[in-house]
Amino acid sequence: MVVHWYNNHMVQTPKHAIVVERIQTGVRMEKRLLKVLKALAELKDMTLGDLLEGIVLHAFEGKAPFSSQTLKEIEKLREIYGLRLTAADSHQLKEQKR
């Protein structure tokens, strides 16, 4: 096992990288939400895909994906990009007609 830090959390991973098959996907997301996610990925020096995989894998196990420090950084990014949506808004968003 290798011990390293991810999002200010100590993480143990297998000594060798886990080989996976990734596919390209085209998902539509709320514009400001995507801006915050991209900025966070840049801040953490990772790809957007890696960030999303981490968030989803944590959620599948009922674990919080972010440390308190990262949550503070997210709040700043939300303010910068005007993202006021919350978890209560999920599954209620309707796409604006062009």
Predicted regions and their residues:
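Short, basic amphipathic alpha-helical segments that act as recognition/interaction helices
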Residues: K44-L71
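Surface-exposed, Lys/Arg-rich phosphate-binding patches that contact polyanionic backbones
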Residues: H16-I18, I23, K31-D50, G54
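Residue-level detector of alpha-helical secondary structure
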Residues: Y6-N7, K38, E75-R78
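Short Lys/Arg-rich basic patches
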Residues: M1-K31, Y81-A88, E95-R98
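Short, positively charged interaction helices/loops
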Residues: E61-R98
